UniProtKB/Swiss-Prot annotation:
Designated name of the protein: Large ribosomal subunit protein uL29
Record-linked InterPro entries: Ribosomal_protein_uL29, Ribosomal_uL29, Ribosomal_uL29_sf
Gene Ontology MF, one: structural constituent of ribosome
Gene Ontology BP term (one): translation
Domain of life: Bacteria
SUPFAM superfamilies in the record: Ribosomal protein L29 (L29p)
Keyword Ribonucleoprotein: yes
Presence of the UniProt keyword Lipid biosynthesis in the record: no
Family: Belongs to the universal ribosomal protein uL29 family.
Lineage: Bacteria, Bacillati, Bacillota, Clostridia, Eubacteriales
Example of a GO cellular component annotation carried by this entry: cytosolic large ribosomal subunit
Keyword annotations: Ribonucleoprotein, Ribosomal protein
Amino acid sequence: MKAKELRELTDAELNKKLSDSKEELFKLRFQLATGQLDNPMKLQEVRRRIARVKTIIRERELGIRRA
């Protein structure tokens, strides 16, 4: 999901997206450790999604508006 799309979500939806992504990352790390992970790039995608969501939440806390 792109940052532009994430900015259209409400705070509650962003927090839900963040918790879902963290849970998904946990599961992917577990699969990596047990050797069952098919697509290692999925880890990077989920980490970046978490970073995007956290960035948008922080922007809202600081009152920063991005185009």
